[in-house]
Amino acid sequence: MSDVEVGASEDWCREHARVVARSFYRGMNLTPADRRAGLFAVYTWMRAADDAADDLSADEALPALTAMRVRTERIFAGRWDGRAASDLAVTPSERGRPAQRFWPAFASAVASFPLRGVWFDDMLDGLESDAVALPGEVRFAHSSALATYRHRVGGVVGLACTALWGVREAGMWGEALHLADARGRAFQLINIARDIGADWKVGRVYVPRSALERHGVSAAMLASWEPSGACAALIRGLVRHARAELVQTWRYERLLAPDCAAAAWALKASYQGIAEVLENDPERAVCGRRARPPKWAKALIAARALTMRPWMVNA
């Protein structure tokens, strides 16, 4: 791959993240310039995989994700040079579409940062399980089973971000990766709580059977918000569990490279904002506007991250 090809791919990934990631783009953009291109490339890889699982039928999604896995493995093995035009496509029907323009930037990120192929394998495993799930199926019996899924599609995001951001000292890698996985799993639980209604509409149920039974509701009852008191208690329970997990990761920013801590803290603060909205108005999980912090709060998060170093004084 030429520098021109990589640069064009990185530019495309940045613009894609700006349009698609929306509010989280602010947090990602706090990453220093020398690491930002890698972050956008990895984000775009993850978004492409997620879109394949979400937007294609199972018969289409599984081959697409398998092709993506093969290409990713080749990149990590150093056996993809990007010269074959056909190698830019996930499936023959995708050939030439702009959504595949992230591969040169992703390959450059893999070559430049200590990313691990197993993380991306894990994410694809999680997304494949989404693609084959039966509509309306309660997939997880207990929270322990959900925890594995949360690692695959949430914890892996934290691990990859840590590899891109780097740590303050070499001896901090182990703890930083452990906390990154935990934080990503907490973020994913907030995502699950926020998107219960939207997920139900496409036949997906992530709330464990044990939680539904504890509150005396079915997945269908939760999606229709009846009875409201039990449904609200369930949502608040999920959110409080996630917030408790986030508290346990308070040291994470202190382990990161100093110039990357602001980006990590801003993303955490954004998710805390989503959690607060859901605690105050849990019905937003199934109807009304998608739960997110107000615009003024997003601006304040970015300003605080840049000027106040809040992770040094707050847990």
Regions picked out by a protein language model, each given a short descriptive name:
Residues 1-187, 193, 197-315:
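Catalytic cores of Mg2+-dependent Asp-rich isoprenoid enzymes
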